Amino acid sequence: MSALNLTRTDASVASTSKSEHVEAADARSYVIRTYGCQMNEHDSERIAGLLESDGLVRAESEDDADVVVLNTCCIRENADNKLYGNLGHLKSWKAKKDGRQIVVSGCLAQKDRDTVAERAGHGGGGMGAPHGPRAAAQHEAARTSDTPITEILEAAVVDDHAMFPSALPARRETSYDAWVTIQIGCDNSCAFCIVPAVRGEEMSRPYGDIVDEVHQLASQGVTEVTLLGQNVNSYGRDLQLAARRAGDDTAKLRPLFADLLRDVGAVDGIRRVRFTSPHPKDMRPETFAAMAETPSVCEHLHYPLQSGSDE
């Protein structure tokens, strides 16, 4: 099995059918356990897509799997205890069959990299939050090595737009709705949130890539999309600042997220548009206007009100 070429931008979104799994009964299989937020859920879809592109098939349970991926969260209560408890359980699971592997991905793997590497030592691999897209290459390296493989960044940085979660193949759980990543990282420093430390600075995905993906999703029968980011209503700020620093005086600051809502909502076949999560300090009248004037944008806000606390 060769390592997957991760420089491609194949944004395939079709769910793999159960019959395809049956036909590939002799292939190595995987299970993914996901903890935490919608970003992690979408990351897991992409990890699954990459693993299947590399020849693995989805197993119905851990008992049937050769590879278990634990995609972790470090925000939810007792997340670390759940992870380390699972690693303890999986130690006996791994011993029952030669060639089994455990890969730890996500925010907790980034935050507690040394501890995770030590606890997952019997398992085979560990990836930080930015390295979910390297799941297939990580799996191959761990499979052919006698020692644990870890690939956890000192700083959470993704500098290639081709490595955005939504720019990679996915195995989606449903055929009618889809996550669409528009941004990763966050430039805020809220006392209650550790996300900037594990997912890095804000980085907006190119506008055209997002709209193109939504068109592709609609052509495949998706009717509902959720735009994902740590602070979606600051989307595009970094793109425009970069253009202005490069001498483009026409790159005026404008409400790019409001524009994005309108353009995504106008895609033929898309009936519902949601987004999460906005930040109160970056919510602008233009965004509310776009919500009111775009029928497909749902009348719903997921608001982190604790960010307004002065305690």
Question: What is the meaning of each model-derived region?
Answer:
Residues 99-103, 111, 219-311:
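Conserved SAM/AdoMet-binding glycine-rich loop
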Residues 1-236, 256, 301:
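Proteins enriched for Cys/Gly/acidic motifs involved in redox and nucleic-acid/cofactor modification
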